[in-house]
Amino acid sequence: MLFRSVKKIYTQQKEMYDEKKKSIAARIVSLHKSYVRPIVRGKNGKNVEFGAKVQLSCVDGYLLADHLSFDNFNESTKLETSVDSFQRRFDKLPEHIAMDQIYGSRENRKYLAEKNIRASVKALGRRPKNDGASDAEARWRKRKQRERNRIEGAIGNSKTNHDLGIVRSKNAKTEQSWIQMALFSRNIMLAAAKM
């Protein structure tokens, strides 16, 4: 395994040197974890992170993994996956979705409208003049965005208290298991606290 990684790194580096490229697709960035890809972030102090990227849903405080990948995927393309996962788990569609602005693409808005699912993203276009209905909608959106902020807090809590921050496994399968078990552990603790 290690020898294959070294050989692949050599091939990639040689290709970059010969063709005078600055980057290459699926570039290996870790000798021991050749499946890991860099994930560019917009966070302060951390421009690039390495590891798995997980798309989560939060239902009644429980975190559920809808999509897990070591590749840098665009979250906005995975909204249908999350809705399908919800429907499989609960045998119904969600009434509403509290989501980040990145999910507010025209395709996603159209998809949610077709499924009669309310979304907590701002409407496209100009805001209507002093309309009572639009004010109520804005208040509802703000309330749902506060719920979404709880998800961010739950992720931070899971990184600190449930070993999601430091994954100590050595291959892709065990790393996925580690992440799933950390989420499971968090959800069990939450269920026990609610009893």
Residue ranges with predicted function:
Residues S5-G45:
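A contiguous, basic/glycine-rich beta-loop/short-helix subdomain that forms a polymer-engagement track
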Residues S30, Q55-S57, L64, A98, ...:
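Structured core elements
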Residues P38-I39, L63-A65, N72-N74, Y103-N108, ...:
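Flexible loop/turn segments at secondary-structure boundaries
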Residues K43-R89:
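Electropositive, glycine- and tryptophan-enriched low-complexity nucleic-acid-binding patches
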Residues L93-D100:
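Short glycine-rich phosphate-binding loop at a beta-alpha junction
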Residues Q101-K173:
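Helix-centered, glycine/charged polyanion-binding patches within enzymatic domains
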Residues K170-M195:
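Charge-patterned, long linear interaction tracts outside catalytic cores
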